[in-house]
């Protein structure tokens, strides 16, 4: 009897975790924060690959182009 209960609990945990993982991936794809990318417009100063916000185009001679 106890083994059946343990198996049932294990199966329920597996189903719930799979369901939660599936919804988590959907939430990340739909999130506006993930889709929105900030970038520096042309003419703004830049410092290459070490800067936090990249250029919308290319960093050339310390200016975004």
Swiss-Prot record:
One of its GO terms (cellular component) is extracellular region. Expressed by the venom gland. Keywords: Calcium channel impairing toxin, Disulfide bond, Ion channel impairing toxin, Knottin, Neurotoxin, Secreted, Signal, Toxin, Voltage-gated calcium channel impairing toxin. GO terms for molecular function: calcium channel regulator activity; toxin activity. Residues 1-20 form the signal peptide. The presence of a 'disulfide through disulfide knot' structurally defines this protein as a knottin. This is Hainantoxin-X.2.
């Amino acid at each position: 009897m106890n083994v059946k209960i343990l198996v049932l609990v294990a199966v329920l945990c597996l189903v719930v975790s799979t369901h939660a993982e599936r919804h988590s991936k959907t939430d990340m794809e739909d999130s506006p924060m993930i889709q929105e990318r900030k970038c520096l417009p042309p003419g703004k100063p830049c410092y290459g690959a070490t800067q936090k916000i990249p250029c919308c185009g290319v960093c050339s001679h310390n200016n975004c182009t």
